[in-house]
Amino acid sequence: MRVLGIDYGDSRIGIAISDPLGWTAQALETITWRSDVEVPLKRISELVEEYGVKTVIVGFPKNMDGTVGARGEKTIEFIDLLQQRIKDIEVIKWDERLTTVAANRTMYEMGIKKSKKKLVVDQIAAVYILQGYLDSKGKVL
C-alpha cells in the first residue's frame, strides 16, 4: 500500500510517494497554486486515486518550542478540507521541523543550482516528511 507525503505551503505543495511496500519515499511533483485551494485538492485527489493511496502524511509545522503558530493553523485548515474532499483516507500530521533545512542542505550537497532549487525544495521536504513516517513504522529490509 502506497503512502503520500505532503509538504504544504501557501504557494507550492511538495508531493512524495512511497514505494508499493511502504519502505522508501520518492519525490513525485510540486503543485503550484495561489488562492484557489481547489487546485491542490483536485490534484491530490487524482494522485490518491492513481496510486491507490490509503494514508496521507502532511508535514505539520510547529515552532521549535512545540507550539503551533499561524502556519500550523493554515495546515490544519488544509487537512480539514482534504479530509472533506477525500473521504476514504487516513490523514496523519507529521512534525516537519527542520525538513526544509535538511532539503536545502541536500540540494547544496548535490550541487543543485540556485535557479532550480525553488522547483524541487518542496518535493525534497515532502520526501523527508514521508521517509520519517515510514522509518517510524519500523520496516526493515
UniProtKB/Swiss-Prot annotation:
Annotated SUPFAM superfamilies: Ribonuclease H-like
Assigned EC number: 3.1.-.-
CDD domains associated with the record: YqgF (cd16964)
Cellular component GO terms held in the UniProt record: cytosol
Superkingdom as given in the UniProt entry: Bacteria
HAMAP family: Nuclease_YqgF (MF_00651)
Protein function: Could be a nuclease involved in processing of the 5'-end of pre-16S rRNA.
GO molecular function, one term: nuclease activity
Main location: cytoplasm
Similarity comment: family membership: Belongs to the YqgF nuclease family.
Localization, UniProt: Cytoplasm
GO biological process: rRNA 5'-end processing
InterPro entries xrefs: RNaseH-like_sf, YqgF, YqgF/RNaseH-like_dom, YqgF/RNaseH-like_dom_sf
Keyword terms of this UniProt record: Cytoplasm, Hydrolase, Nuclease, Ribosome biogenesis
Protein name in UniProt: Putative pre-16S rRNA nuclease
Taxonomic source organism: Acetivibrio thermocellus (strain ATCC 27405 / DSM 1237 / JCM 9322 / NBRC 103400 / NCIMB 10682 / NRRL B-4536 / VPI 7372) (Clostridium thermocellum)
